[in-house]
Curated annotation (Swiss-Prot):
High-level lineage: Eukaryota, Metazoa, Chordata, Craniata, Vertebrata
Tissue spec. comment: Widely expressed.
Gene3D superfamilies referenced in this protein's UniProt entry, alphabetically: Cytidine Deaminase, domain 2
Chief place of localization: cytoplasm
UniProt-recorded name of the protein: COP9 signalosome complex subunit 5
Protein family: Belongs to the peptidase M67A family. CSN5 subfamily.
The keyword Hydrolase appears for this protein: yes
Motif mapping: JAMM motif: 138-151
Broad enzyme group: hydrolase
Domain MPN intervals: 55-192
Length: 334
């Protein structure tokens, strides 16, 4: 019974995150030093600022990053990723946490973190992990996956001196709320570069107090298409992890775990609606009503989408609780 429940929980998680199994463990883990040196010497990303289009993350690297992000609670955490490059794809093989000071809005790396980083990479090479640092990750607890002004500056600096490099952002709070990993991978454009107009990106809820920071810098970077993979070794390790932790799925509730997050979402939504109402009220006394109305209606439409998202997540959490109650608390004894 426990084994079947564990297997079902693992398959559900893998399907939700579109986890793909690598055809051969040697194929994905083989490190060709000569090939990597040739890529570094050619530097194709300098000729095309949109060169890297894909980001592949191993299942265990993903779990390590998400667990680290979740352990930080409402504080941001930071770590480094090891990997390699394969054409237009950046492959993240492993990750490790950094000893940094975190706040609710930023992470600050001190000298000790840089020393730890250098020592970790050196020791990893001694045990046969030849991959180099390929990026950094940090968390945005409760406010989505995007790059703030500080993140953009940090990533620009990394791309200037440590190419190839990618920035990954994880939202552990929304991951629990939605039941699917909320993660984004990004690369910045060089200073002064004006990117071509692109189609609308996937919509995500941005808190009112973060909208300005998001809007000012959103054209300075682009998102990579993220996918996840697992090898046969990953599969065995994941099975061991699921055998230990799958019961948490039944014993926990997103309604209780994320109660503060849901309350914050409702409060943020009320502020957005009040702001839109005030702008619509002023619009009747202004000239050029069409442009003003369109902006106000756009804000109302976004507030509606945010409301629907919060409602759906709450309903899913409630449905999960009802199903568990029916299964375990209302068994009719014949």
């Amino acid at each position: 019974m426990a084994a079947s429940g564990s297997g079902m929980a693992q398959k559900t998680w893998e399907l939700a995150n579109n986890m793909q199994e690598a055809q051969s463990i040697d194929e994905i883990y083989k490190y060709d030093k000569k090939q990597q040196q040739e890529i570094l010497a050619a530097k194709p990303w300098t000729k095309d600022h949109h060169y890297f289009k894909y980001c592949k993350i191993s299942a265990l690297a993903l779990l390590k990053m998400v667990m680290h992000a979740r352990s930080g609670g409402n504080l941001e955490v930071m770590g480094l990723m090891l990997g390699k490059v394969d054409g237009e794809t950046m492959i993240i093989m492993d990750s490790f946490a950094l000893p940094v000071e975190g706040t609710e809005t930023r992470v600050n790396a001190q000298a000790a973190a840089y020393e730890y980083m250098a020592a970790y990479i050196e020791n990893a090479k001694q045990v046969g992990r030849l991959e180099n640092a390929i990026g950094w990750y940090h968390s945005h607890p409760g406010y989505g996956c995007w790059l703030s002004g500080i993140d953009v500056s940090t990533q620009m600096l990394n791309q200037q001196f440590q190419e190839p490099f990618v920035a990954v952002v994880i939202d552990p709070t929304r991951t629990i709320s939605a039941g699917k990993v909320n993660l984004g991978a990004f690369r910045t454009y060089p200073k002064g570069y004006k990117p071509p107009d692109e189609g609308p990106s996937e919509y995500q809820t941005i808190p009112l107090n973060k909208i300005e920071d998001f809007g000012v810098h959103c054209k300075q970077y682009y998102a990579l298409e993220v996918s996840y993979f697992k090898s046969s070794l990953d599969r065995k390790l994941l099975e061991l992890l699921w055998n230990k932790y799958w019961v948490n799925t039944l014993s926990s509730s997103s309604l209780l775990t994320n109660a503060d997050y849901t309350t914050g979402q409702v409060f943020d939504l009320s502020e957005k609606l009040e702001q839109s109402e005030a702008q619509l009220g002023r619009g009747s006394f202004m000239l050029g009503l069409e442009t003003h109305d369109r902006k106000s209606e756009d804000k109302l439409a976004k507030a509606t989408r945010d409301s629907c998202k919060t409602t759906i997540e709450a309903i899913h959490g409630l449905m999960s609780q009802v199903i568990k109650d029916k299964l375990f608390n209302q068994i009719n004894v014949a």
